[in-house]
Regions:
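Short acidic-glycine-tyrosine-enriched beta hairpin
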Residues: 93-117
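Residues that flank catalytic or metal-binding motifs in active/ligand-binding sites
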Residues: 47, 81, 119
Length: 170
């Protein structure tokens, strides 16, 4: 056997062990259809479609729908955030850029901003860690984390006779 064959054989053996460990411990891949989660009111003119909750990493994925003239109050994130604009436009009042359909936004922890959409938008967000809503003096008025999002979703479902979709939980 050549050295190259030995390397390939070793690699295949390692991958086989990885596959066995994955099959033993990993969660199954999940699929959630577009109707699997309702639009849940968040603040006036703002709705959230919760997509997944991961308490292991204190993260959550959702689609944020801001109707025309809607605003998500002044806030900061304690972990990184990634967003992909599905439709419409929005901006942070504190910055000069405007995000439009097809744009990707990444946010570093600790930045303070106020999301606003003049004409409405839908954006997919992946949030890591808590989101803190602030008053004019930078005091934390409310902290929103993965457990808050879970409660937000479950409470809305219970109040509206909607079954809680267990596929959303990691």
């Amino acid at each position: 056997m050549t050295t190259s064959d030995e390397v390939i054989k070793g690699y295949v053996e390692i991958e086989s062990r990885v596959d066995k460990m994955r099959d033993k411990y990993a969660l199954q891949e999940g699929y959630i259809d577009g109707e699997g989660s309702p639009w849940v009111p968040f603040v006036p003119n703002v709705y959230i479609k919760h997509l997944t909750f991961d308490i292991r990493s204190s993260s959550a994925a959702n689609v944020l729908w801001v109707q025309a003239g809607g605003e998500l109050g002044r806030h900061r994130h304690r972990g990184p955030v990634s967003g992909y604009v599905i439709e419409g436009t929005w901006n942070y009042r504190e910055y000069s850029w405007v995000a439009k359909a097809g744009d990707f936004v990444r946010e570093s922890p600790g930045r303070t901003h106020t999301l606003y959409s003049e004409k409405g938008m839908k954006t997919f967000f992946w949030l890591n860690g808590p989101l803190e809503f602030l008053d004019a003096e930078d005091r934390v008025m409310e902290s929103v984390d993965v457990f808050w999002f879970i409660n937000h979703y479950e409470t809305y479902c219970q109040e509206n006779g909607i079954p809680v979709d267990q596929r959303l939980y990691l």
